[in-house]
UniProtKB/Swiss-Prot annotation:
The keyword Ribosomal protein applies. Keywords: Ribonucleoprotein, Ribosomal protein. InterPro entries: Ribosomal_protein_uL29, Ribosomal_uL29, Ribosomal_uL29_CS, Ribosomal_uL29_sf. The keyword Iron does not apply. GO terms for cellular component: cytosolic large ribosomal subunit. This is Large ribosomal subunit protein uL29. One of its GO terms (molecular function) is structural constituent of ribosome. Pfam families: Ribosomal_L29 (PF00831). PANTHER family: 60S RIBOSOMAL PROTEIN L35/50S RIBOSOMAL PROTEIN L29 (PTHR10916), LARGE RIBOSOMAL SUBUNIT PROTEIN UL29C (PTHR10916:SF0). CDD domains: Ribosomal_L29_HIP (cd00427). GO terms for biological process: translation. Belongs to the universal ribosomal protein uL29 family.
Length: 63
């Protein structure tokens, strides 16, 4: 996910995206704790996507 794609979305769409990413992160954490997560690098990418979405939301709030 690129920041340029996120800047085109509305705040409501960004909040929906953020909620989905947080759910995905929770599910991945549960899988990692039980040893079922094969690709552990996906946790890092989801965490960074969450940060990107939050950054764009804060930028839009400041405008």
């Amino acid at each position: 996910m690129k920041a340029s794609e996120l800047k085109d979305k509305s705040v409501e769409e960004l909040n929906t995206e953020l909620l989905g990413l947080l759910r995905e992160q929770f599910n991945m954490r549960m899988q990692a704790s039980t040893g079922q997560l094969a690709q552990t690098h996906t946790l890092r990418t989801v965490r960074r996507d969450i940060a990107r979405v939050k950054t764009v939301i804060n930028q839009k709030a400041g405008q």
